[in-house]
Amino acid sequence: MGLAGFARPLQWFKSQWLWLLLSIAAFWLLMRVQVEWLWFGQFDWQGMLLRRWLWQLGGLLLALLVVATCQLWQRNWIKLEGASNLAEPALPLHGWRYGLGLLGCFVVVVGDLVLLTRLAWLACFKPFALGHWWSEPFEDIWALVIPLSCVFISICVMLGNARGGRIAHLMGCFCFSISIARGWGLWSLALAIPPTGIKEPLLGADVSFGLGQFPALAFALVVLLAQLVLTTSTTIWMKLAQPESLSDWVFKGLSPRQCDVMRPLIGIILLTLSALLWLSRHELLWTQNGTVAGAGWLDAHLILPLRSLASLAILVLAFLVIPFPWIQQRRLWRLIASIIGVGAILLEVLLAPFVQWMVVKPRELKLETPYIIRAIKATRKAFQLDSITTTLINPQPQLTQLDLEQGASTLRNIRLWDSQPLLATNRQLQQLRVYYRFSNAAVDRYRFVPDKANRQQVMITARELDQAALPKRSRTWLNRHFVFTHGYGFTLSPVNTRAPDGLPDYFISDLGTSTRLEGSSELGITREDVKEAVPIGRAALYFGMLPSPYALAPSKLKELDYPVGDKNIYNHYLGSGGVPVGHPWQQLAAAMYLFEPRLLNTGSLTINSKLLIRREVRQRVSAIAPFLEVIGDPYLVSTSVNSRDHDYQAKQNQYWIVEAYTSSRTYPYAANLPDGRPVRYLRNSVKAIVDAYSGRVHLYVSEPRDPIILGWQRLFPDLFKPLEEMPSSLREHLKVPTDLFNVQVQQLLRYHVTDPRIFYSGDDVWQVPKELYGKRQVPVDPYHITAQLGSQESSEFLLLQPLTPLARPNLSAWLAARSDGDHYGKLVLLRFPSQTPIFGPEQIQALINQDPQISQQFGLWDRAGSEVVQGNLLVVPLGKALLYVEPVYLRARQGGLPTLTRVVVSDGKRIAMAEDLGEGLRALVDGSSKKAVYLNRNDLPPIKAADQSN
């Protein structure tokens, strides 16, 4: 039969396997699509998912059109007849010139493949980072780039001629298509983002161009340029690497016909490069190379004109390359345009450092002043520092009884419990089983007594299920996914009281039928007040902040609800959330989605069973709105929601509040964060509410003037609701996120200065002060207080950050973020007079530790085998004075329970230490308490901390 007889069956066999593999891939994709469709269906958001798919499909079709055009051009060019003896060849190569051309072409192909592979990698795993791909970390891509480069080298070596280049081109086309399709978020936002009406002063573009259009255009031009260059270089490679050329080390050259067909593609490449250079002028607006952020004098007067000139020269060159018949003396003009374009680029590289050193540096302040003003204004705008209300206060040097009376509402909520000691106590007393875990303690406030103007500040900790803590013998597949499915309940503690033994008081503790609700006679709160203000209801936590595997519920197996003594109480999931898996085809889809074949043979599923996935609430919000950044820890709220709101279940009381942000790296003239993170614009634009039982998600827009979120609202109008539609019982628990506040504090350290001369000299830079916590010196974190702001009669919930001058410990200012009612999100800067030194946290702690009686008591406790932990030092405005409060905890050196042992108070002039805050204040004001240690500062040696620098 011969070899030819076997060729046809072999070809048939290969095609059958190919179709089988394609069918399996299509079926697997269909199953994944079904699960995703049903998952979004639980929120009635299939329309949003469909729009996302359509955007990706549109991008894919556009990419395939470009790819098909490139493939068609390449195939037609390859078919053209090469150089002959009758025609004068172009670019003939031989000897070392041929080797150099071969090497150069190879380097271009590999470089293009590396770039396209990197973009495809980001598109698959970080699609919303494509707009700033050049600044993304590169280390995790090497695992893909190096093998691909080796594969290409092997292909070229083994296959030799055209096939190696063709496969490389197909690889690049595949990466190009993935990048375009998965970059849907860039294109859609660029089309939908509204103008802000704010023009940047250098190029006159609206700020929204930098926030939305620039990232999309930059990515589109880069990926298109890479694809076109790859098409050209692989095509040339296929000609250079012909067997006869490799054997003779000679390339005969290109025929005139081949050159004519090549010129339009070269012209398009040059047009794309020209557009990219023109767009790069906007990149000057967010550089960090000069004195301040954004374009400086050198950028505006040298680099900007040079880039414009280079772009125009390459544009002219592109038209000269394309064979238009009416253009005469083509070679001369091409040479002139090339010299101008390359010369402008070289001048930018070579001349800019010289001009900076010779012209700008000697007159830097004068030349850069207009640009410093722009940078200050833009940075303050980008981080909402321009809306800060500044108040000057001059506190009295000594606390009086009148201050205590005026600040009575503040004193009722002075926080004495830090989150770390409270968590340590909860983990030993309230976790109750090894598989429960308290992840964090969130500060919040509840209105226990309706007729009181002020709400009680509390700490709430959710008791979540930590499957990693299950004993090994209990980590079976059925236990992990059918039985141990949820956490249960929470603890609620007042921040300002303690039990007689020094442990925390609890409004709510324990769990299940053993749940204890207690009032506080000290605070005037009854058990009924707690029961009314903090309903518990159905306290199972199926969704939380800990990573959790998928769960299948309800099923034939009962789920562990909570333990009671030595017994366990079991229950079934009754929520509406989840993906139905009651029917065989749904189970097949879930098994393929999870790569879990055991689902098909478990026998434990019922017709009502549901698959619960994405149970970590931050991951859940990110899956629904991947264009939002979910930063920081969510916090739990337990409250009643009006049953008239059909989006909420009447029996459900526990909800997670998740903070979601929009950000940008391309806000004109705005500065990076001082810690180096390339964030130049940040808004806490969305508050997400997640039902802890059913997983239902609600997204509310908290920054309606943010152009980025306005763009997403245009694209997905059904996804977001205005903040006013959030139930009032949940809105009462909103607070300014600590992560956003920290970013604003970092920028304020330098950008509180608006005078360009002072800003340039750096004479008025602030810093976050430090304090001694335990045995370590740490920066003072922002802390929540319920206090009166200025001359207000009632207190409000504030997030406060004290600030000191750089390298000096005296207090310069407070930044306070308001969270209550109509004042939500407003920033207030309380500035202290510079001529009157106000003690900062370091100095007060130095006073405390130099007090002979206090230090003696600390030493006695240490020698007795206990460890003294000095807690967070709070600086609180009280009347017309300042009050410094530091809790002191005592714990055994080996895993003991932290107990609140003492409270140290000071007004900067006097110090008192007592068993509770009331005794300490009485001692501080009039020295009347016999239970307190009291000392006047005049009796102390000079403060050592005053001479320390940070």
Curated annotation (Swiss-Prot):
Transmembrane segments in this chain: where?
A: 20-40, 53-73, 102-122, 141-161, 173-193, 209-229, 259-279, 308-328, 335-355
Superkingdom as given in the UniProt entry: Bacteria
The subcellular localization recorded is:
Cell membrane
Q: Is Coiled coil included in the keywords of this UniProt record?
A: no
Q: Which UniProt keywords apply?
A: Cell membrane, Membrane, Transmembrane, Transmembrane helix
- Which positions are tagged coiled coil? none
The protein's matches in InterPro entries, at most eight in alphabetical order, are given as: UPF0182
Does this UniProt record's set of keywords contain Disulfide bond? Answer: no
User: Mostly located where?
Assistant: membrane
Question: How does the entry describe its membrane topology?
Answer: Multi-pass membrane protein
A single GO cellular-component term on record: extracellular region
Q: What family does this belong to?
A: Belongs to the UPF0182 family.
| HAMAP family associated with the record | UPF0182
Listed name of the protein: UPF0182 protein P9303_14611
Which source organism?
Answer: Prochlorococcus marinus (strain MIT 9303)
